[in-house]
Design a protein with these regions (language model features):
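Short intrinsically disordered, low-complexity coil segments enriched in acidic
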Residues: 1-6, 152, 178-179
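PAPS-dependent sulfotransferase catalytic core
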Residues: 1-19
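Polar low-complexity intrinsically disordered regions
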Residues: 6-7, 22, 35, 119
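Non-catalytic, charge-rich alpha-helical accessory subdomains
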Residues: 10, 20-32
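Well-ordered alpha-helical segments embedded in enzymatic catalytic cores
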Residues: 17, 21, 110-113
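PAPS-dependent sulfotransferase catalytic domain
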Residues: 28-158, 163, 168-178
Length: 179
């Protein structure tokens, strides 16, 4: 809470705004179910979702062996000069990994989210997927997701996928240094 809120702590109005954020963001989307890729499982975000979403929260948690995650990042920033860890004048792999693993780093934030998801009171809201299962057994993994979401499964195409594009917008990671 910042000083302005402390000067006029109007909780009801703030709750009204927070409760309308998700609805307003997706109001032009025709889909009944939307899977939003974001940091939902950090402790503060998860609390806000449960309090303001207006429906049960369901999170799909993709987890991967930490050494494999680190190896993937190393391969990325060693082969992509514009990768954001290369933009901080870090001299070696260890310094670049520290950037990712420090308390506010990308990997550390994800690990904290997974840790929070694994708490007994949160597990019922989460479906955990091992990265290796998604890659090697995509169909049974997807069927598990559909069951968790209480939706009817339909066959998917798992090869020769197109770049994600929706509502005329494509996913753009160029700010992270990817071409």
């Amino acid at each position: 809470q910042d000083d302005v809120f402390k000067n006029y702590p109007d909780h009801k109005s703030l709750d009204n705004v927070l409760s309308s954020v998700y609805y307003n963001y997706y109001k032009d989307w025709s889909q009944d179910v939307i899977i939003d890729r974001g940091p939902a499982l950090t402790e503060g975000n998860f609390k806000l979702l449960k309090q303001h979403l207006g429906q049960p929260v369901k999170c799909i948690v993709l987890w991967r062996d930490l050494l494999d995650v680190l190896a993937s990042y190393i391969k990325w920033f060693e082969n992509e000069p514009t990768a954001y860890p290369n933009q901080y004048n870090k001299k070696n792999i260890e310094e670049k990994l520290h950037l990712l693993m420090k308390d506010t780093g990308a990997i550390a934030k994800e690990l904290k989210g997974i840790e929070h998801a694994m708490k007994p009171e949160n597990k019922k809201h989460c479906f955990f997927i091992r990265y290796e299962d998604l890659v090697t057994q995509p169909e049974p993994t997807m069927k598990g997701i559909y069951e968790f979401l209480e939706m009817d499964y339909y066959p998917h195409r798992f090869h020769s996928l197109n770049q994600f594009n929706f509502n005329g917008l494509g996913h753009d990671d160029s700010d992270l240094g990817q071409n």
